[in-house]
């Protein structure tokens, strides 16, 4: 019987950070939980980052994942927004790293390709495939659905890497 691996996907953002937890065993996927962390826009940047860090740390402690998958940041025309997203992403990398989890990073196009089969697709397509692959999945936001897609992407790439290691050993 295959070992069960618990994966948390994290879709970082300063306003909202989505998270999704799945269990992965052999070729079986099971939804565990998903949600969205929000920071208080009335607070200063440092306080907002602390809110995200505490929220992620609490989720990691509650669900005890074995591995984390975090979305790569993308650069847009608004440099300030990109910097803030980068800072939120640093929290998304730091919290699982401090919990001694291996952290894997995936570009948005790689996540889309893993979940819907093409690198450029609408959010609705991703959300529909998350529901197909995880029929019991419940998510309260687009960010939580994207986080589940990240966890699914990691389960796919983890399987490929494991299979490759076995056949080349």
From Swiss-Prot:
Domain of life: Bacteria
Cofactor binding notes: Binds 2 Mg(2+) ion per subunit.
EC number, UniProt record: 3.1.21.10
Residues that coordinate or bind Mg(2+) 1: 11, 143
The protein's name: Crossover junction endodeoxyribonuclease RuvC
NCBIfam families referenced in this protein's UniProt entry, alphabetically: ruvC
Binding site for Mg(2+) 2: 71
Enzymatic class: hydrolase
GO MF annotations in UniProt: crossover junction DNA endonuclease activity; DNA binding; magnesium ion binding
Catalytic reactions on record: Endonucleolytic cleavage at a junction such as a reciprocal single-stranded crossover between two homologous DNA duplexes (Holliday junction)
Cofactors: Mg(2+)
Annotated source species: Bartonella quintana (strain Toulouse)
Cellular component GO terms, alphabetical: cytoplasm; Holliday junction resolvase complex
Function: The RuvA-RuvB-RuvC complex processes Holliday junction (HJ) DNA during genetic recombination and DNA repair. Endonuclease that resolves HJ intermediates. Cleaves cruciform DNA by making single-stranded nicks across the HJ at symmetrical positions within the homologous arms, yielding a 5'-phosphate and a 3'-hydroxyl group; requires a central core of homology in the junction. The consensus cleavage sequence is 5'-(A/T)TT(C/G)-3'. Cleavage occurs on the 3'-side of the TT dinucleotide at the point of strand exchange.
Gene name for this UniProt entry: ruvC
Family indicated by similarity: Belongs to the RuvC family.
